[in-house]
Amino acid sequence: DQSFTNPERVGIALSESGAQGDWRLFFLTRDRVRDVTLAEVQRVADQYLVSSNRTLGTYLPTDAPVRAPAPAKVDLAKTMQDFKPQAAAAKVEAFVATPENLDARTQTFAVGGLKAAVLPKGTRGAAVRATLTLRFGDEKSLFGSGEVPGAVAALLDKGTRTLTREQVQDRLDKLKTELSIGSAPGRVTVTLATRRDYLPDAIALVGDLLRNPVFPEAALAEFKQQAITAIAQQRKEPDAVADNTLDRWGNPYPRGDVRYASTFDETVQDVNAVTVDKLRDFHARFYGAAKGEFAAVGDLDPAAVRTALQSAFGDWNRGAPYVRVPHPRVDVQPERVLLETPDKQNATLL
């Protein structure tokens, strides 16, 4: 009742109730608090104040506690009197990214089956970003591959014939390069964020990762554990359950087809079926630079990039012949589907 003496508090309370669905909830809550009984309070306490729903802290006194020292006082004026900032960053060109300017600046060339496009332009810190995509296989040759293609891509940076997993990461750090690898049916994509001077060496490292992976047993075990843990979590999430159901709804393809949408249980089975021998066999059969694309934008030397690509992929003209997997339109009958996700208060509508 005291809140009614403060118009600001009343306004905020009514606004919050309105956001929950009805501004009158504020008054309903007031009436429910007024009418609550001791028995109801006890019932709720017994229901919710259980050991699995609480965090317990224990105070353990000690005669000589070890405490971190207090922060030292700093004389800011004295600290700053000798400060000399770094030289201002060099100005870069004001490149206007119109279609005409992009076409005029872009240089294209081919390295074997690899089509390349580079756009040299000034950037802060000589930054450059690059993407490499290799394409392979078709719906028949990829049939039954399960989770093997994804596992191959996930383990590419876990060691090569000449570099351990730690050495790969050390090399990336030395080259000031961020690298990520992703995959989809019939392709693997590598993205790079680096600097002008390091781009050729980063391309050479990517070539080593793609051509000479060793697929360590420990890395495969780690991949399986992470994948199965993620699936176990998805089983409980409304959005993941809804997405999986929608993907499977009206899907006409048999299990094993790359367009088939697996259940959570089927995905776990496919993950468990992955072996190092299967990874090596898939890599030997499908990977190669016979079909692919490379693109780079930023502060770069086109001639140096071309030389690096030629050295890394010029003689790797192999891999299963690529044919794009068709995705024809599929007529799906409309239907309303309700799915239960126990212990989850949120919901997802698709």
Give, region by region, the residue ranges found by the protein language model.
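M16 family metallopeptidases and their MPP-like homologs
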Residues: 1-35, 55-59, 117-212, 224-232, ...
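Proteolytic maturation boundary segments
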Residues: 27-135, 293-295, 301-340, 347-348
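Peptidyl-prolyl cis-trans isomerase
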Residues: 44, 214-215, 219-221, 274
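Solvent-exposed, non-transmembrane alpha-helical starts
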Residues: 68, 141-145, 200-202, 217-219, ...
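Structural alpha/beta core scaffold segments of enzyme domains
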Residues: 113, 270-273
